[in-house]
Amino acid sequence: MSETPRRGPTRRDLLRSGALAGAAAAAAPMAGAGAAAAHGGGTAPAGDLILTNGEIHTMDRRDPVVSVVAIRDGEIVYTGDKESHARKEFTDPPRAIDLRGKTAVPGIIDCHNHIVLMGNRPGYHTPLENAYSVADVQSTIRARTRVAPAGAFVTTIGGFHFNQFEERRLPSLAELDAAAPHHPVYLSIGFTGPSVTNSLGKAFFESVPGPDGPVTVGADGAIAAGQQTGRATLALRRQLTFEDRRRGARDAMRYAVSLGVTTHLDQGAFQAADAPSDGAAHEDNYRMHLPFLSVFGDGDGIVRLRINFLHMDADPASVALGERLRNAFPFFGNDLVRTGGIGEFVAPVPSDPITSGSPGNLRWLEAARKVAQARWRAEVHSLSTTDFKAEIDGFALINAEFPITDLRWVVGHVPSITEDYVDKLKALGGGINVTGFRYFAGTPTAAGPPYRMLADNGIPLGMSSDGMQIAPMNPWVHAYYATTGVNALGVAINGNQLLTRQEAVELYTRANGWFLGGVDEDRLGVLAPGRLGDVAVLNRDYFDRRRVGDADLKKINSVLTVLGGVVVHDAR
């Protein structure tokens, strides 16, 4: 291509987090200023840009493929095949980039992930979801050490699994030493390990003082799953400064746009207790967004962040959810940073049948009732038959008291679900977002999700990553699994539930607008006049099965990512 010129909450915490919407609104007007300084600032990136000579899949319902897209002040003003017509939309000559035939799609929307957790990781977090051997791991870590100061931890916490490596194991202490002789390294799988470290990391972990140390590390660098991994992760978290978290937020955003993911509906975290029992999915729910908001306030935000608020109040006396609903606002912010709903939990998951009268079920119903009465969107998490039955039956009970059919309540993940419950959810105005987390460690008897059944049913359906604890964030790895049914071990486990490549990208773009809701639905996910100019230009032609085989889908990334007409990633 070429171109021309983290404790329990006090009321103060709750009010602070409730004011997050206001913080988002306050930060966002500055957020676009740096990226769009040449265009007078504004509330979000607002660039002038023409992309020409591309295979640009607009993803509108007629699915035209065009060669030219023009973006003025951050909004698309022309799609078609005439550059001369595009140029008429501008008073001053815009920047123009020749895509040289490259395939482009709308900026990817991930409607369920944990990018805020990723940005709050300790150390220099280094995604390994694109590594397929120990040698790849070493190469990735070695590259990261060129950025990390000597002595700083290079870490990977979640988002990968040794099943994806040719050797089907984690790297050893010696192998990590070879990759990073001057940096401690810590790699941890999933929520609670197992983990591995190198010599410098071993020395650090074995010297952690009590009561939460030391960490037991094997001669080969291995750290057992559970308490020992919990101690290790905690020791690293206790070293985090706010500046570290700001750097992590920037790194997370840079990684996302390198994949072409421009919009993220973040689904929160479990409330951290500053204890070894905290896993990779724990953080301070009342402060975790602040590093991101600070970065946006600096004008360095390069993704669109949508924020759901996760609630797991097991104590009947807890006022957290009620205070949230009283002190925050849904869908509040601007095109760059905006609040969403309650999710991916409204309370601990109920048990089937929801009408059992158990204390847990009563608490869940009361929480859902509060959300419905406040007219908020809700998203819940289903990993089993018990989960989806109790939750969808619970939705129906709540709907009889406070109608939810226009609120778009969502069930997420669904490695399994029966079509009668899909129909029941659809009748309640709900939707389902699916994730391919079974790719890492699924088996023929524990596969899913039922992509094909859901797509054919007609319920609002979206694709998400749930990255990055137990799943990769990379949408192209998820597209690989959704279109092949093959897991990381190379075993076909979900072959009767496949999507086409076109369907997978539609779910990651246009269809995911439904899950954002509000004004976003008509502004994102499609390249058409009046919509925001978010584009991902790919390194491979995703749609050409002849030239890009199934295995190559996992190698797709973005060579050029545009947010509101501003180039936020350029790897040409």
Locations of the language-model features?
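Divalent metal-binding segments
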Residues: S17, H39-T52, H57, R61-E323, ...
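Acidic (Asp/Glu)-rich catalytic clusters
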Residues: R326-V337, F402-I404, L425-A427
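N-terminal secretory signal peptides
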Residues: M1-T10, A24
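His/Asp/Glu-enriched, well-ordered alpha-helical/loop segment
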Residues: R369-W409, H413-P415, E419, D423, ...
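C-terminal region of N-terminal signal peptides and the immediate post-cleavage residues
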Residues: A24-T43, R540-F543
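Non-cysteine beta-strand/loop elements that form the S-adenosyl-L-methionine
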Residues: N334-A347, G430-R438
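Twin-arginine (Tat) signal peptide motif
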Residues: R6-L15, A33
